């Protein structure tokens, strides 16, 4: 079977099966070969790789990954796409389709049972309405993932890749960059999909580090500190950290002084390193209470 990454090839498959796109599932199929190639290049897929794909659609990206990788497991929630995928992937015995909701899948078990225990790469054109939960599931759970290369809404990619002091920098930037080095792989304007979405897209690469870059003593306190600091962006740290719920203003002032952080600064100006120092001091303070 030829590549599916063209408007005509995709339309032919859709018409053959009388497939109806679901807005609620965020179904927009990629129809540009150049972007497919950039995704493959950004994911650095090699012969021995095990790949997890979420939302394979009609198998456009799945096919191209299956030609290179050791094994591709595609997780698709829409049962109406299963017979289509069975057809479009029929000549690739190293691809497998799982008809489940990714957010309900035990990824650790899936990797163990179907992908030899890993390591794995997540490569996908993600449904935009659940992009962040999917990415964070792979980063926060004990999954042997080395790379996440995904098509996401442009605004989400900008936030994941943002640096301190910019309008896009926030809790998501820190949550992703705490685990990964990030890069923008490609831009994908809305006309590269059918049906055409209302937003432009970006392929972002998240390369998971072998070792933790930041010296964080208590991750729970760290992420709570980050969340509180961005709770109300216009508030200074002296005021926003009150959102933690267990520190009074005098204690916050003392902690900021010890961290060598001006109490008038706002959360969006702090680097991850500064948040690490700040949360470690908060953790020490809480532990000694």
Swiss-Prot record:
It comes from the Bacteria. GO terms for cellular component: cytosol. Its EC number is 2.1.1.182. Its main location: cytoplasm. It is found in: Cytoplasm. The keyword Lyase does not apply. Keywords: Cytoplasm, Methyltransferase, RNA-binding, rRNA processing, S-adenosyl-L-methionine, Transferase. GO terms for molecular function: 16S rRNA (adenine(1518)-N(6)/adenine(1519)-N(6))-dimethyltransferase activity; RNA binding. S-adenosyl-L-methionine binds at residues 28, 30, 55, 76, 101, 125. Pfam families: RrnaAD. The keyword S-adenosyl-L-methionine applies. It catalyses: adenosine(1518)/adenosine(1519) in 16S rRNA + 4 S-adenosyl-L-methionine = N(6)-dimethyladenosine(1518)/N(6)-dimethyladenosine(1519) in 16S rRNA + 4 S-adenosyl-L-homocysteine + 4 H(+). HAMAP family: 16SrRNA_methyltr_A. Specifically dimethylates two adjacent adenosines (A1518 and A1519) in the loop of a conserved hairpin near the 3'-end of 16S rRNA in the 30S particle. May play a critical role in biogenesis of 30S subunits. NCBIfam families: ksgA (TIGR00755). Belongs to the class I-like SAM-binding methyltransferase superfamily. rRNA adenine N(6)-methyltransferase family. RsmA subfamily. This is Ribosomal RNA small subunit methyltransferase A. The lineage of its organism: Bacteria, Bacillati, Bacillota, Clostridia, Peptostreptococcales.
């Amino acid at each position: 079977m030829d590549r599916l990454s063209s408007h005509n090839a995709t339309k032919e498959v859709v018409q053959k099966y009388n497939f109806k796109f679901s807005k609620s599932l965020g179904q927009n199929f990629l129809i540009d070969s150049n972007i497919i190639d950039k995704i493959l290049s950004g994911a650095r897929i090699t012969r021995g790789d095990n790949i997890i794909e979420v939302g394979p659609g009609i198998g456009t990206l799945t096919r191209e990954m299956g030609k290179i990788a050791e094994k591709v497991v595609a997780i698709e929630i829409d049962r109406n796409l299963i017979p289509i995928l069975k057809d479009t992937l029929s000549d690739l015995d190293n691809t497998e389709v799982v008809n489940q909701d990714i957010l309900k899948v035990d990824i650790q078990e899936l990797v163990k049972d179907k992908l030899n225990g890993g390591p794995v790469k997540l490569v996908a054109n993600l449904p935009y309405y659940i992009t962040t939960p999917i990415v964070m599931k792979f980063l926060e759970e004990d999954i042997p993932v080395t790379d996440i290369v995904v098509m996401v809404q442009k605004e989400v990619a900008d936030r994941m890749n943002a640096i301190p002091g910019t309008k896009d920098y926030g809790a998501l930037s820190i949550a992703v960059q705490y685990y990964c080095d990030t890069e923008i792989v490609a831009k994908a304007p809305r006309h590269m999909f059918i049906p055409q979405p209302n937003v432009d897209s970006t392929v972002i690469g998240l390369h998971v580090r072998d070792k933790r870059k930041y010296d964080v003593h208590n991750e729970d306190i760290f992420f709570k500190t980050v969340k509180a600091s961005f709770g109300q962006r216009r508030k200074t740290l002296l005021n926003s950290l009150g959102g933690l719920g267990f520190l009074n203003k005098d204690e916050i002032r003392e902690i900021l002084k010890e961290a060598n952080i001006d109490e008038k600064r706002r959360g969006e100006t702090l680097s991850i390193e500064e948040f690490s120092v700040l949360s470690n001091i908060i953790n020490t303070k809480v532990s000694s209470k």
